[in-house]
UniProtKB/Swiss-Prot annotation:
Induction: By acidic conditions. Could be induced by EvgA via the induction of YdeO. Keywords: DNA-binding, Transcription, Transcription regulation. One of its GO terms (molecular function) is DNA binding. SUPFAM superfamilies: C-terminal effector domain of the bipartite response regulators. This is HTH-type transcriptional regulator DctR. PROSITE patterns: HTH_LUXR_2. The gene is dctR. May act as a transcriptional regulator of dctA. Could be involved in the regulation of the genes coding for the type III secretion system in enterohaemorragic strains. Residues 133-152 bind DNA. Residues 109-174 form the HTH luxR-type domain. It comes from Escherichia coli O157:H7. The keyword Cytoplasm does not apply.
Length: 176
């Protein structure tokens, strides 16, 4: 069984056609996940305009104990699903490489441009969603010094001179 988590109906249709050999289920919100029915599924997540990280959605996915998770994202997030095997791929992956990845064969999938820790991605998502510093500190339960440290590291990784340049960053749509 394949669970396709996306808000993009064109993406789902493409995945359904590629994965025609199996049972393909479209998931748009966390209420549609059935922990018993979808146990040990193969999960494919599209994060474009659908940032499921750091939410109950990801917790639900972890409870499914998926066989493998493929995440379409320009970010590589370290240990985002604990011990569940995760592969990050760009949306520009070829169909041949994607099918090889699904079948467990070797494919030359390019690595994500940006590699972040879970906390860095969480801070970055909060900043992209225009949360105030105080709200971020309260939500993530971190100190101001830790926040500034994460913010500095994120700016270095994304090659930003000022944090307000983030709104024009090429991957901003994957954070909201």
């Amino acid at each position: 069984m394949f669970l396709i988590i996306t808000r993009d109906t064109m993406f789902f249709t493409a995945m359904k056609n590629i994965l025609s050999k199996g049972n393909v289920v479209h998931i748009q919100n966390e209420e549609e996940i059935d922990v018993m029915l979808h146990q040990n599924a193969f999960v494919i997540i599209d994060t474009l305009m659908n940032n499921v990280f750091h939410s109950n959605f990801l917790t639900q996915i972890e409870r499914l104990k998926p066989v493998h998770v493929i995440i379409f994202s320009p970010f590589n997030i370290k240990r985002c699903l604990g011990k569940v095997p995760v592969t990050f791929v760009p949306r520009t992956i070829t169909i041949i490489d994607f099918v090889a990845l699904i079948n467990g064969s070797y494919c030359s999938v390019p690595e994500a441009n940006v590699s972040l820790s879970r906390k860095q991605h969480q801070v970055l998502s909060c900043i992209a969603n225009q949360m105030t510093t105080e709200d971020i500190l309260e939500k993530l339960k971190i100190s101001l010094k830790t926040f500034y440290c994460h913010k500095h590291n994120i700016m270095m990784i994304l090659n930003l001179k000022r944090i307000n340049e983030l709104v024009r960053h090429q991957h901003i749509d994957y954070l909201v």
